[in-house]
């Protein structure tokens, strides 16, 4: 029987976590308006690595400029973010921990006040972040663009030294909105039955896996 203190090997990649204790993604709201990581947020995560966590997971980071949901949320939608992200991963690795980034898009939970854009979702849904109270339904071009944004964001994480990424499919954000029956009422290939509703998530996953190295973890 394995103990929490035992190392864990990711069989498909060969990466080894020094133990089975994982820091979950937790929102800090400490970073800068342009999406770059602040020293305060870096220090918070590194302190947890020093505390012995085998895997450090960042807070949710938006892959598209229009996917931001709250103040102080760091981003990975632009190459300008790579430098600060690399500082984080270097310091975490120095403590012997793996480092994962949690990638997400807020969808109808994005903030029009912060992004300047009306939130988009799988369908027209209520939206506290929208001035009108409702999101727009994502068009085909929006979906393809966001899939590409997730892919580019994952590639930036590779460049920044992350060991992998976690696709945030919970808490009512965009991936979850596509998966849900109540939030996805589309009748095209992106909705309907479970196969259609899961297409968005699977397209993101496949697109990322086609681009990143085999040693990079995607979950």
What is each PLM-predicted segment?
Residues 1-25, 92:
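N-terminal amphipathic alpha-helix/helix-capping segment at the start of soluble metabolic enzymes
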Residues 20-22, 55, 98-102, 164-166, ...:
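Structural preference for beta-strand elements that scaffold enzyme active sites
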Residues 23, 48, 52, 92, ...:
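Conserved, mostly hydrophobic/aromatic
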Residues 32-50, 74-94, 111-114, 140-155, ...:
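Glycine-rich anion/phosphate-binding loops
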Residues 42-64, 159-164:
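Catalytic domains of carbohydrate-active enzymes, especially glycoside hydrolases
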Residues 63-64, 76, 112-138, 177-198:
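Aromatic- and acidic-residue-enriched carbohydrate-binding clefts of CAZyme catalytic domains
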Residues 73-100, 179-218:
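Alpha-helix-loop-beta-strand connector modules within alpha/beta enzyme cores
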Residues 98, 104-162:
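Non-globular sequence segments
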